[in-house]
């Protein structure tokens, strides 16, 4: 894995107007929406991934332990921003987003670069047996002190990318664990409302 550049920024540090941001009202789903110029500055209801080919249209996803996944097809000039939590990952939202980029914009998965931002790591993501079963045994990386399964959710996202045809060399995964790092928002650790914002925008 490769470290993804992760920084705190305020509005004055953004290279686009905050009023242009397109976000989504996340519902832990596999619902994906295509964003066009008419949606600039809006919140898209009831979805967990956004795709656009419009320039200078920033897409925002909010997370606090879930995996933020950004996709960039340099050839077709298409980007996507994905909130891949437990439910979304189980429902294959990352794979489905790649498929929508291919079907709606003509993207070739081999041209897509993917990056995952800070998220909860396998040492910290404790789930029950039923949840672990839904993920599959290969993503169980150990057991907690209470003998509950520990899941590597980023590896599940990575497999979806690879199975879609995205090259392993084009997948970058942040090594920052939100649960282990107090400077990053973590629902598991703090049960707080604070969120990490992940942006992607075509210049």
Regions found by a protein language model. Name each.
Residues 1-203:
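Active-site microenvironment for binding and transforming phosphate-containing groups
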